[in-house]
Protein backbone atom coordinates (compact mmCIF):
# COMPACT_ATOMS: atom_id res chain seq x y z
CA UNK A 1 0.00 0.00 0.00
CA UNK A 2 1.13 3.52 -0.74
CA UNK A 3 1.89 5.82 2.16
CA UNK A 4 -0.35 8.86 2.51
CA UNK A 5 0.88 12.29 3.55
CA UNK A 6 -1.03 15.44 4.42
CA UNK A 7 0.78 18.22 2.56
CA UNK A 8 -0.96 21.14 4.21
CA UNK A 9 -4.20 22.28 5.69
CA UNK A 10 -6.62 25.15 5.46
CA UNK A 11 -10.06 25.67 6.86
CA UNK A 12 -12.92 27.95 5.89
CA UNK A 13 -14.67 30.27 8.24
CA UNK A 14 -17.69 28.80 9.94
CA UNK A 15 -20.88 30.48 8.77
CA UNK A 16 -22.98 29.73 11.85
CA UNK A 17 -25.83 31.75 13.28
CA UNK A 18 -24.85 35.25 14.45
CA UNK A 19 -21.41 35.09 12.82
CA UNK A 20 -20.18 37.62 10.29
CA UNK A 21 -20.33 34.89 7.62
CA UNK A 22 -23.82 33.52 8.29
CA UNK A 23 -25.16 34.88 4.99
CA UNK A 24 -22.22 33.69 2.87
CA UNK A 25 -23.07 30.50 0.96
CA UNK A 26 -20.92 27.49 1.83
CA UNK A 27 -19.68 27.18 -1.75
CA UNK A 28 -18.18 30.70 -1.54
CA UNK A 29 -16.40 29.87 1.72
CA UNK A 30 -15.09 26.62 0.26
CA UNK A 31 -14.02 28.25 -3.01
CA UNK A 32 -11.79 30.65 -1.06
CA UNK A 33 -10.05 27.67 0.55
CA UNK A 34 -9.63 25.88 -2.80
CA UNK A 35 -8.17 29.02 -4.40
CA UNK A 36 -5.55 29.27 -1.66
CA UNK A 37 -4.72 25.55 -1.82
CA UNK A 38 -4.26 25.66 -5.59
CA UNK A 39 -2.00 28.69 -5.20
CA UNK A 40 0.26 26.49 -3.03
CA UNK A 41 0.12 23.31 -5.13
CA UNK A 42 -0.17 22.53 -8.82
CA UNK A 43 -3.88 22.30 -9.70
CA UNK A 44 -3.03 20.00 -12.61
CA UNK A 45 -1.85 17.35 -10.12
CA UNK A 46 -5.21 17.20 -8.29
CA UNK A 47 -7.22 14.19 -9.46
CA UNK A 48 -10.29 14.67 -7.24
CA UNK A 49 -11.73 17.05 -4.67
CA UNK A 50 -13.52 15.63 -1.62
CA UNK A 51 -15.21 17.93 0.87
CA UNK A 52 -17.14 17.34 4.06
CA UNK A 53 -20.22 19.50 4.56
CA UNK A 54 -22.97 18.94 7.09
CA UNK A 55 -25.21 21.95 6.44
CA UNK A 56 -25.63 21.91 2.68
CA UNK A 57 -28.93 22.33 0.95
CA UNK A 58 -28.44 19.33 -1.30
CA UNK A 59 -26.57 18.75 -4.50
CA UNK A 60 -22.82 18.53 -4.91
CA UNK A 61 -21.59 21.66 -3.13
CA UNK A 62 -17.98 20.58 -3.68
CA UNK A 63 -18.50 20.81 -7.44
CA UNK A 64 -19.78 24.38 -7.06
CA UNK A 65 -16.75 25.24 -4.90
CA UNK A 66 -14.33 23.83 -7.47
CA UNK A 67 -15.91 25.68 -10.39
CA UNK A 68 -16.08 28.94 -8.45
CA UNK A 69 -12.41 28.52 -7.51
CA UNK A 70 -11.60 28.32 -11.22
CA UNK A 71 -10.55 24.67 -11.24
CA UNK A 72 -10.93 22.51 -14.32
CA UNK A 73 -14.32 20.99 -15.08
CA UNK A 74 -12.50 17.70 -15.63
CA UNK A 75 -11.64 17.30 -11.91
CA UNK A 76 -14.29 15.13 -10.22
CA UNK A 77 -15.75 16.51 -7.00
CA UNK A 78 -17.48 14.63 -4.18
CA UNK A 79 -19.41 15.97 -1.19
CA UNK A 80 -19.55 13.87 1.98
CA UNK A 81 -22.52 14.61 4.27
CA UNK A 82 -22.22 12.72 7.55
CA UNK A 83 -23.50 14.96 10.29
CA UNK A 84 -20.56 15.84 12.59
CA UNK A 85 -18.13 13.49 10.84
CA UNK A 86 -18.10 14.76 7.25
CA UNK A 87 -14.59 16.21 7.26
CA UNK A 88 -13.05 13.15 8.88
CA UNK A 89 -14.81 10.85 6.42
CA UNK A 90 -13.56 12.98 3.52
CA UNK A 91 -9.97 12.54 4.74
CA UNK A 92 -10.46 8.79 5.26
CA UNK A 93 -11.95 8.40 1.76
CA UNK A 94 -9.07 10.28 0.14
CA UNK A 95 -6.45 8.32 2.09
CA UNK A 96 -8.05 4.98 1.20
CA UNK A 97 -8.07 5.82 -2.51
CA UNK A 98 -4.40 6.85 -2.41
CA UNK A 99 -3.41 3.73 -0.46
CA UNK A 100 -5.23 1.49 -2.92
CA UNK A 101 -3.47 3.10 -5.88
CA UNK A 102 -6.62 4.71 -7.29
CA UNK A 103 -5.29 8.23 -6.76
CA UNK A 104 -2.11 10.24 -6.36
CA UNK A 105 -3.20 13.62 -4.99
CA UNK A 106 -6.56 14.45 -3.46
CA UNK A 107 -7.70 17.85 -2.29
CA UNK A 108 -9.83 17.37 0.83
State each model region's role.
Residues 1-75:
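Conserved "HGTGT" condensation-loop signature of ketosynthase/thiolase-family condensing enzymes
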Residues 3, 104-105:
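Residues that mark the start of a beta-strand
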Amino acid sequence: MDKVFILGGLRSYIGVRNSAYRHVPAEHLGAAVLKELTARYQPSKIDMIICGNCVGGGGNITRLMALEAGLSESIPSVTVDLQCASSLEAVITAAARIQSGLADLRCV
